[in-house]
Curated annotation (Swiss-Prot):
Entry-linked InterPro entries: BUG, Bug_dom1
Family of this protein: Belongs to the UPF0065 (bug) family.
Top-level taxon of origin: Bacteria
This protein's name: UPF0065 protein in clcB-clcD intergenic region
UniProt xrefs under Pfam families: TctC (PF03401)
């Protein structure tokens, strides 16, 4: 969705059409591998997220080393996630949910869109910081995961605001807290988990960045970075992103590279320490 919001505006800036092609499968690995093999001419771009920082742990046979295969161009947007439970859940707040989980190890389950997805990692970090043992139930995508959450087959889910916003507003799920340090404008009245769960350091933002094959010339990277930053500054793009719960970002290619390195280190430590790639928490 972030790609589609930007495509039309960037097309105007560059003076040529920008086409968005979704390449699902294996957490985005299939699409990423295709871009990695593409000519480094600035015409085949990759929009990817947190998964680009963790794919090597969950997909050991992946055909590329992401940090060597791609060059960062610009940070596009960030989206907080939200902790949700079924509408008829007995838990009215994050503290009571985590208190029950601590007293009953393995009895509270959480749904994810699959191993290594941002949904999986956000819940795993919450469990690690809260010192609780949660049962991970991975699904093949967020849609079936959300369906089972609504039906009460799993206890909780830490999903993107974009995906859960309509369910929250329709009363099909109950929101207990957002993963940003500040309240999310799109979900007024829902507290940050840093406060609601007494975890002052807890923050998870799913980020979306633009990347190109690493062989791409710095001049092309600069042109693309300028186009993205111009688009991200426009009121219409900022509003369109805000409507899906996202915040426009921007900045230098170097800044995205630093974020990427920090995310590789942050999530790598969590994955290895808690053996998340073996589905154990």
């Amino acid at each position: 969705m972030v790609s589609r919001v930007l495509a039309q505006r960037v097309s105007q800036t560059l003076g040529q059409p920008v086409t968005v092609e979704n390449r699902p499968g294996s957490g985005g690995i299939i699409g990423s591998a295709e871009v990695a093999r593409s000519p480094a001419d600035g015409y085949t771009l990759l929009v990817n997220s947190t998964v680009l920082a963790v794919d090597k742990w969950f997909y050991p046979n992946v055909a590329y080393d992401a940090r060597k295969a791609f060059a960062p161009v610009a940070l596009l947007a960030t989206i907080p996630s939200v902790l949700v439970v079924p509408a008829d859940s007995p838990y009215k707040d994050a503290r009571s949910l985590l208190a029950y989980a601590k007293a009953n190890p393995g009895k509270v389950s959480f749904a994810s869109a699959g191993m290594g997805t941002s949904i999986h990692l956000a819940a795993a970090l919450l469990a690690a910081q809260a010192g609780v043992d949660l049962l991970h139930v991975p699904y093949k995508g967020s849609t079936p995961a959300a369906a089972d959450l609504i039906a009460g087959r799993v206890s909780m889910m830490v999903d993107s605001i974009t995906a859960q916003q309509s369910f929250i507003k329709s009363g099909r799920v109950r929101a207990l807290g957002v993963t940003s340090l500040q309240p999310a404008p799109s979900l007024p009245g829902i507290p940050p988990l840093a406060q609601a769960a007494d975890l002052p350091k807890f923050e998870v933002l799913t980020w979306f960045g633009l990347f190109v094959p690493s062989r791409t010339s710095p001049d092309i990277v600069k042109v693309l970075n300028t186009a993205m930053n111009e688009a991200l500054k426009t009121p219409e793009v900022q509003k369109a992103l805000a409507d899906i719960g996202a915040s426009a970002q921007g900045g230098t290619s170097q800044a995205l590279g630093v974020l990427w390195d920090n995310e590789i280190d942050r999530w790598g430590q969590l994955i290895v320490h808690h053996r998340l790639n073996t589905n154990e928490l």
